[in-house]
From Swiss-Prot:
InterPro entries reported for this sequence: SCRL
Keywords noted in UniProt: Antimicrobial, Disulfide bond, Fungicide, Plant defense, Secreted, Signal
Protein name (Swiss-Prot/TrEMBL): Defensin-like protein 245
GO cellular component terms given for this protein: extracellular region
UniProt cross-references to PANTHER family, sorted A to Z: DEFENSIN-LIKE PROTEIN 245-RELATED
Recorded superkingdom: Eukaryota
Disulfide cysteine pairs (residue numbers): 39-96, 50-79, 58-89, 77-91
Primary localization: secreted
Subcellular location field: Secreted
Length: 97
């Protein structure tokens, strides 16, 4: 009788485990989406100006919103001034997951 109760409790716990894990994966995916606004267009608007080295400014903006692993791949960006003291950063060779 005790064995049956233990088996039943174990089955219930294992049935709850996958739903708990999938919720964690979903929240992780939402965090990634918030940190990676660049994909799929590979463009994003930031405040500021392009300055003397707009490409580097855009790359710095990219790195501040992207996973550190992006630094392992070569990325070049273009900076285009926009109205209201904004810049459009375009990084066409960036690899999106």
């Amino acid at each position: 009788m005790k064995f049956a109760a233990i088996l039943l409790v174990t089955c219930v716990l294992f049935s709850l485990l996958p739903s708990h894990l999938s919720q964690g994966e979903e929240s992780s995916m939402n965090i990634d989406a918030q940190r990676r606004p660049w994909c799929p267009s590979k463009k994003q608007v930031f405040g500021g100006s392009c300055g003397n080295d707009g490409a580097q400014q855009c790359l710095n903006n990219l790195l501040s919103t992207w996973d550190p692993s992006v630094r392992l791949s070569p990325v070049s960006c273009n900076c285009t001034p926009q109205p209201n003291n904004n810049i459009l950063c375009s990084c066409p060779n960036m690899i999106c997951p």
